[in-house]
């Protein structure tokens, strides 16, 4: 926030221009992240975006009350201003093709089209007017915050998109009900999102599902059934079985289907790319390269729907692969980095934290439900200064003091130091608390000599000395 609102924004170092051109199809989280790292490497980057604004699902799928668009737009603007060229309103197959990009002299192409097509509800009559997907509904509201879904709305599904659609619908003044075929505990949405929807007045009808939709005189009639939980499937999840004679009808203005998302098969066909068994682009998972060509893919079109931070990470990964390709280097996955951990809290010897005081964690403050349900103001208000300070003080400061940028992990990875091969006994440590001002923790000592200088200069005592 400080950087966004300052006059001098952070600007990364941009390498000397290489003369190489990279086309990126899609300006969502993954595509924008890849563009950032490619422009920093000195390559010319052009993004082809289907919508009129960049940001992808962050722009059109995450509601304003969760992600204020003015913040998102500022961050995107900073990336674009690094020298990235972006063209809006471009549709794959209609305006651009792989062959066309090759003719224009692009040295590499990155496909980052996301997974924005809605999965079918598989309900009779779901194609009638008034039935809309969760993705399309959220996009319409993002473009027109005064969009009117009518007085009564049903949302079908139990994931985060269903919750977002329901919480958005209720902000537009609609009496909103979620229909979910399983129990509340089995809803795939984040628990805190379900709680928030409850607070805002969204009704949740569990063990209920639509089976038929008809339209009469501008109203939608939905025939629903009650479900009961059956046997567990191979994944351990209980199946849902229709209860005989449990049919009931609802009359609504809009039905929002939000049971999942998938990759556009039309786009995949236009690129002549082979999809995998789940309809996603078949690319090397760790590099994003498709075969041995100059074509790459990243983000949700490769992995399926997920969280934005994962898509951004894959965008960076793809950019690194493209940079290697353009430099004539072998495109291969980054070696798995060495990770060392002391384990979970219950696995750590008690002497490491017996003297540490337990302090409460602060939850982010929120607008009260009655103050937010009629508007799109940001719900989470962030920490107050005192809360932020006390949260920061929860850090145990257990890191290495030798250097800010520790190279030990990189060196262990480079030399392939295997903890199994170099296994030894677990080292135990002692604590010396005999002095009133100084506590010596041998597990933290890196022989830097700071304690000696501190005791001599500040405390004017030589209780600690350094011996070579």
Describe these PLM feature segments.
Residues 20-46, 161-170:
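N-terminal Rossmann-like FAD-binding beta1-loop-alpha1 element of flavoenzymes
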Residues 47, 51-82, 86, 139-141, ...:
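Rossmann-like dinucleotide-binding cores of NAD(P)H-dependent redox enzymes
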Residues 127-151, 234-305, 347-350:
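FAD-site-proximal beta/loop scaffold in flavoenzymes
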Residues 1-2, 53, 84-86, 393-418, ...:
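Iron-sulfur cluster-binding cysteine motifs and their immediate structural context
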Residues 1-14, 124-135, 274, 279-280, ...:
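Non-heme iron-sulfur electron-transfer modules
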Residues 7-25, 30, 59-60, 90-96, ...:
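Ferredoxin-like iron-sulfur electron-transfer modules
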Residues 165, 298-329:
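A conserved FAD-binding loop/helix module that cradles the flavin
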Residues 1-16, 74-94, 118-172, 276-287, ...:
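Glycine-rich dinucleotide-binding loop and its adjacent helix/turn
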């Amino acid at each position: 926030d400080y950087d966004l609102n300052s006059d001098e924004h952070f600007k990364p170092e941009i390498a000397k221009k290489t003369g190489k051109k990279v086309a990126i199809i899609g300006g969502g989280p993954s595509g924008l992240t890849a563009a950032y790292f490619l422009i920093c490497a000195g390559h010319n980057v052009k993004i082809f975006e289907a919508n009129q604004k960049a940001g992808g699902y962050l722009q059109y799928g995450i509601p304003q009350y969760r992600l204020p668009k003015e913040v998102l737009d500022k961050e995107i603007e900073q990336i674009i201003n690094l020298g990235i060229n972006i063209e809006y309103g471009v549709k794959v197959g209609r305006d651009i093709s792989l062959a066309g990009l090759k003719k224009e002299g692009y040295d590499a192409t990155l496909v980052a089209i996301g997974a924005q097509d809605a999965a079918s509800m598989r309900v009779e009559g779901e194609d009638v007017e008034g039935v809309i997907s969760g993705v399309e509904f959220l996009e319409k509201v993002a473009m027109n915050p005064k969009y009117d879904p009518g007085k009564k709305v049903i949302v079908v599904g139990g994931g985060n998109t269903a919750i977002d659609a329901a919480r958005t619908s209720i902000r537009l003044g609609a009496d909103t009900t979620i229909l979910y075929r399983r129990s509340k505990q089995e809803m795939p949405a984040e628990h805190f999102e379900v709680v928030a929807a409850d607070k805002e007045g969204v009704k949740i009808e569990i063990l209920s599902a639509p089976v038929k939709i008809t339209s009469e005189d501008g109203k939608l009639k939905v025939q629903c059934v009650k479900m009961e939980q059956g046997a567990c499937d191979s994944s351990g999840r209980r199946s849902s079985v229709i209860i005989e004679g449990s049919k009931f009808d609802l009359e609504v203005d809009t039905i929002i289907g939000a049971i999942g998302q998938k990759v556009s098969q039309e786009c995949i066909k236009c690129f002549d790319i082979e999809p995998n068994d789940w309809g996603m682009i078949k690319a090397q998972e760790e590099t994003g390269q498709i075969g041995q060509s100059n074509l790459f893919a990243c983000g949700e079109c490769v992995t399926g729907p997920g969280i934005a931070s994962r898509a951004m990470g894959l965008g960076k990964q793809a950019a690194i692969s493209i940079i290697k390709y353009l430099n004539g280097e072998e495109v291969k996955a980054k070696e798995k980095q060495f990770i060392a951990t002391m384990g979970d809290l219950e696995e750590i010897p008690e002497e490491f934290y017996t003297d540490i005081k337990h302090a409460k964690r602060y939850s982010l403050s929120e607008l009260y439900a009655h103050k937010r349900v009629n508007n799109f103001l940001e719900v989470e208000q962030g920490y107050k200064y005192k809360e932020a300070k006390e949260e920061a003080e929860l850090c145990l400061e257990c890191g290495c003091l030798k250097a800010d940028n520790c190279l030990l992990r990189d060196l262990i990875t480079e030399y392939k130091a295997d903890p199994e091969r170099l296994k030894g006994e677990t080292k135990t440590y002692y604590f010396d608390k005999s002095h009133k001002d100084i506590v010596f923790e041998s597990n933290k000592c890196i022989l830097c000599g700071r304690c000696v200088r501190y005791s001599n200069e500040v405390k004017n005592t030589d209780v600690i000395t350094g011996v070579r």
